[in-house]
Regions:
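Low-complexity, polar/charged sequence tracts that form flexible coils or short amphipathic helices
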Residues: 93, 116-119, 139-142, 161-164, ...
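The feature captures the LRR N-terminal capping module
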Residues: 1-135, 144-153, 157, 166-205, ...
């Protein structure tokens, strides 16, 4: 929002319905139980319901190696969407060690993030693992140049092993199984760089342990179970707050958000709007 030189910034808050979606399509709420759905036997992942081995077969590995052979060694952008990839190992990412900037692996069947593979491309700035089967965040120890990370539509329960990313400004964790943010999950240095955080469609009941994200400008937490805005007051640079489809019954802490421009509140338990001056 622009302002004339020498005049105070006007606070413009939009209390509207659902904002334009960032991700195309939103799945129905996850109804899986809290229990794990896979077992580990002899280092191989086994689907607990079907008993099927989820590791790629030799034929699948060979097919993937053939596919990757068409890319030059100096490739900067790999889009490997919807190819039934189960593991990053046959991608041989080390071949792109010096040049790869963007890696798209959305809509595949990847269950694990391996540091040996992802760490082989240390200059990576954008990593897209949207719509896979990942349960734990890992393998990003050497990806210190990462700026955008998309782990939406997976089976992640904890926001772990990303706090060390000093340049990450955009983090997508939409539609996972995250019930709470632990104190160590978003400790420095990531609070210094993070500008946009998307946690919509999870199992959050509060905004606990987000107060250290003092540079955050966008927070998207729609479709959770949040009952209170406690902790929001410290996010003084926040410009967009999307908290529709939660369990709010009153508004608190918004008066300190002087940079706030857009506020999405539809589908809560509010009976009147207060503290929006």
């Amino acid at each position: 929002m622009s302002r004339d030189e020498g005049t105070a910034k006007a606070k413009r808050v939009q209390v509207v319905g659902a904002p334009p979606p960032v991700h195309v399509g939103i799945r129905a709420p996850d109804t899986d139980s809290e229990h794990e759905h896979e077992e580990e036997h002899d280092g191989h992942l086994i689907d607990a319901e079907s008993g099927a081995n989820t590791n790629p077969t030799d034929d699948e590995n060979e097919s993937m190696r053939e596919l990757m052979s068409v890319f030059p060694d100096d490739e900067t952008d790999l889009d490997l969407t919807h190819l039934r990839i189960k593991s990053t190992k046959p991608l041989n990412l080390g071949r792109f060690h010096n040049t790869l900037i963007r890696l798209g692996l959305r809509q595949n069947e990847i269950r694990s993030m391996h540091g040996k593979d992802l760490g082989a491309v240390p200059h990576l700035k954008e990593l897209d693992l949207y719509d896979n089967a990942i349960e734990h965040i890992s393998g990003l120890e050497n990806n210190l140049e990462l700026e955008v990370l998309d782990l939406s539509f997976n089976n992640i329960r904890h926001v772990s092993r990303i706090a060390h990313l000093p340049k990450c400004h955009t983090l997508f964790l939409v539609q996972n199984k995250i019930a709470h943010i632990r104190p160590t999950d978003l400790q420095p240095p990531i609070p210094l760089s993070l500008r946009s955080l998307e946690l919509g469609g999870n199992r959050l009941r509060s905004l606990e342990n987000l107060s250290q994200l003092t540079n955050l400008e966008e927070l998207w937490v729609g479709k959770n179970k949040i009952t209170s805005l406690d902790g929001i007051a410290s996010l003084k640079k926040l410009k967009i707050l999307s908290i529709q489809s939660n369990r709010l019954t009153k508004l608190e802490g918004l008066d300190s958000l002087e940079a706030l421009e857009e506020l999405y509140l539809s589908h809560n338990g509010l009976t009147k709007l207060e503290n929006l001056e």
